[in-house]
């Protein structure tokens, strides 16, 4: 039957990509439908119970800066928070949280059920409705047809998913959930380029059977307790719990080696490529044969369960081998396994077949987000979901798509890497992937993206008000520090030495003093009984005041580096955003070699910058393309196209 209501946007899948996509489209005012095979598993954390980490936390902050749900849901469900790399520079500091699975799922579902313009429907999708080269809706497993102007596919690991435990396997999207076999077959019928990837998960352990007394306790950060959302507060966090650390040993490694003849990975049963940066324990033992032990983190799954996630022993070995290897680990000699570990193989679709908006190049109105694009991780999925949801909304409203730049957001780095380079293994975000990471910090994600989000219609009034207060306070206080001067008479040696290590010998601005590595803003403001502090607090809200202080300090201390990076960006921007005509035949570009023209015709890059990052496309080829565009009067910049861009960097 044809469902009586037509929607603007349909989102298929209710994981981390799907929920952010649906919420974003609905915030833009689009009539949105989220189709999921099970409403009870919306926002499910299918693997480890954690959010964030190096590179990943940056993505979560960016999603939050644009009104997304992941950071706020983590603040409401996080049972341990830590700042990683806290002793290093601000570019690589990252927030990580352990989350209570049940509370996280509840927080996401509450947002979905209370979001205007968004409806939920429980049915697996078996087919896409396509007319010509345009998607017009989706068909469920019982034949209900939903029509829409745009469809966002966020199928995760469900497309023709196959679960492996030892040499036994069965179809499934994850343990306990069916695979999307019919939808996978339909996508293959559409001739979209695809491949096979693999991921895995460890056995879960009953905490009552673990001896924590022989393990190392790993508490979270308590002074202060971090928050994920720019609008978050520590009071939102539930009870905080520690994690625990133990290690594998030589006996563990011998047990694993003895079971490799029944491993689906090492007997050729699994064809998909697994994630390089989250390898299985059998992969670790094989690849790092001389390493005597591997660290294992015992992570609590929640406040109302005894279940623990042993991070570090993901495996698809037979259950008897899993049991033996777990019992060989210190503190887990008597451990009871609640759920066996497994590997899952699934279909993904080559992201080089997508535009920078995440819309398919082959089928108009069809967007892809999450693991279906070859990525791994909740955070990468959520970021893509946000972008796909926004651009589905732009497509419906006939507005230019928003395509974040590499110098603007980790989301821009992520998508650009996917659509220009493709994937041969599950893609994970790291800070090292970003050329401009000093400008792409966690702390300034709102300064980079909230204004863009407001223009696009995904940032609400409360967030916009807090952002403006923060931006104005940072600007005002930075100017005050630059224009307030002190000299040796005003700052005698007995006051200067404890802070600076020596007396001042000439006049300095407060900004000059703060620029010194050893000087902190709070210490400078407390100098001489607070004589140099602002007349009024930075903000009445303590968490916002702390964010303002952090922005001021980083902006002043790293001003020279940030300015140099901004100059590099300006130099690259002219050619980076030059648009390439859709119908350009690269074989007609004079001087372009056959291999290069073939690759460009195959990948159809949207901009000169994207073209430059395709393997085999040389700087000389880019120069020839530029000459061709100028001769023909073709090509236009992002600014000329009218797409929202936002600020690449505020005063940090």
From Swiss-Prot:
Family according to the record: Belongs to the MnmG family.
Positions that bind FAD: 13-18
Protein keywords: Cytoplasm, FAD, Flavoprotein, NAD, tRNA processing
Superkingdom, taxonomy of origin: Bacteria
GO biological process entries: tRNA methylation; tRNA wobble uridine modification
InterPro entries recorded: FAD/NAD-bd_sf, GIDA_C_N, MnmG, MnmG-rel, MnmG-rel_CS, MnmG_C, MnmG_C_subdom, MnmG_C_subdom_sf
Protein function: NAD-binding protein involved in the addition of a carboxymethylaminomethyl (cmnm) group at the wobble position (U34) of certain tRNAs, forming tRNA-cmnm(5)s(2)U34.
Species name: Cupriavidus necator (strain ATCC 17699 / DSM 428 / KCTC 22496 / NCIMB 10442 / H16 / Stanier 337)
Main location as per UniProt: cytoplasm
Gene3D superfamilies for this protein: FAD/NAD(P)-binding domain, GidA associated domain, C-terminal subdomain, tRNA uridine 5-carboxymethylaminomethyl modification enzyme MnmG/GidA
Signal peptide segment: none
Record has tRNA processing as a keyword: yes
Assembly description: Homodimer. Heterotetramer of two MnmE and two MnmG subunits.
Protein name as it appears in the record: tRNA uridine 5-carboxymethylaminomethyl modification enzyme MnmG
Compartments it resides in: Cytoplasm
GO molecular function: flavin adenine dinucleotide binding
SUPFAM superfamilies the record matches: FAD/NAD(P)-binding domain (SSF51905)
Residues that bind NAD(+): 274-288
Disulfide bonds: none
Annotated GO CC locations: cytosol
Cofactor names: FAD
């Amino acid at each position: 039957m044809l469902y009586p209501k037509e929607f603007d946007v349909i989102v298929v899948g209710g994981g981390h990509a799907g929920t952010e996509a649906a919420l974003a489209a609905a915030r833009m005012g689009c009539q949105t439908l989220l189709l999921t095979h099970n409403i009870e598993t919306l926002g499910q954390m299918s693997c480890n119970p954690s959010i964030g980490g190096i590179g990943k936390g940056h993505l979560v902050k960016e999603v939050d800066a644009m009104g997304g749900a992941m950071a706020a849901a983590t603040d409401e469900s996080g049972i341990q928070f830590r700042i990683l790399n806290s002793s290093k520079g601000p570019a690589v500091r990252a927030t990580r949280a352990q989350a209570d699975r049940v509370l996280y799922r509840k927080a996401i579902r509450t947002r979905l059920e209370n979001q205007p313009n968004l409806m939920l429907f429980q049915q697996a999708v078996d087919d896409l409705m396509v007319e010509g080269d345009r998607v017009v809706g989706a068909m469920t497993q019982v034949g209900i047809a939903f029509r829409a102007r745009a469809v966002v596919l966020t199928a995760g690991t469900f497309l023709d998913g196959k679960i492996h435990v030892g040499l036994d396997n069965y179809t499934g999207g994850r343990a306990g959930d069916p695979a999307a076999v019919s939808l996978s077959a339909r996508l293959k019928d559409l001739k979209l380029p695809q491949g096979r990837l693999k991921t895995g998960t460890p056995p879960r352990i009953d905490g009552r059977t673990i001896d924590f007394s022989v393990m190392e306790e790993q508490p979270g950060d308590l002074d202060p307790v971090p928050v994920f959302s720019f609008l978050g507060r520590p009071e939102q966090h539930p009870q905080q719990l520690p994690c625990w650390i133990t290690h594998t040993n030589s006996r563990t490694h011998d047990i694993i080696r003895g079971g490799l003849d029944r491993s689906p990975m090492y007997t050729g049963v699994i064809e998909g490529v697994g994630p390089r940066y989250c390898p299985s324990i059998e992969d670790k033992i094989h690849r790092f044969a001389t390493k005597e032990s591997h660290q294992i983190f015992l992570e609590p799954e929640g406040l109302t369960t005894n279940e623990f996630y042993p991070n570090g022993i993901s495996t698809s070995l037979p259950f008897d081998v899993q049991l033996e290897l777990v019992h060989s680990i210190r503190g887990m000699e008597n451990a009871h396994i609640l759920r066996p570990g497994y590997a899952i193989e699934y279909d993904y679709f080559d992201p080089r077949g997508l535009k920078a908006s995440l819309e398919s190049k082959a089928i108009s109105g069809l967007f892809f987000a999450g693991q279906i694009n070859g990525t791994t991780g909740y955070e990468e999925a959520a970021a893509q979901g946000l972008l796909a949801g926004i651009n589905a909304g732009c497509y419906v409203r006939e507005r230019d798509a928003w395509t974040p730049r590499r110098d603007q957001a980790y989301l821009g780095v992520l998508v650009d890497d996917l659509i220009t380079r493709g994937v041969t293994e599950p893609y994970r975000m790291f800070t090292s992937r970003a050329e401009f990471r000093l400008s792409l910090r966690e702390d300034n994600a709102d300064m980079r993206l909230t204004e863009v989000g407001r223009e696009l219609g995904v940032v609400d009034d409360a967030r916009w008000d807090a952002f403006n207060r923060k931006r104005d306070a940072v600007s005002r206080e930075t100017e005050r520090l630059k224009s307030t001067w002190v000299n040796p008479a005003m700052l005698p040696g007995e006051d200067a030495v404890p802070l600076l290590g020596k007396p001042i010998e000439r006049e300095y601005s407060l900004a000059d003093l703060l620029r010194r590595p050893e000087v902190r803003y709070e210490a400078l403001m407390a100098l001489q009984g607070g004589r140099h502090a602002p007349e009024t607090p930075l903000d009445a809200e303590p968490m916002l005041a702390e964010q303002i202080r952090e922005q001021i300090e980083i902006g002043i201390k790293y001003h020279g580096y940030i300015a140099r990076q901004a100059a590099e960006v300006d130099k690259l921007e002219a050619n980076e955003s030059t648009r390439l005509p859709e119908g350009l035949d690269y074989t007609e570009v004079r001087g372009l070699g056959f291999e290069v023209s073939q690759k460009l015709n195959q990948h159809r890059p949207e901009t000169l910058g994207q073209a430059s990052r395709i393997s085999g496309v040389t700087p000389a080829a880019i120069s020839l393309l530029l000459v061709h565009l100028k001769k023909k009067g073709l090509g236009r910049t992002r600014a000329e196209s009218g797409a929202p861009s936002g600020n690449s960097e505020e005063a940090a």
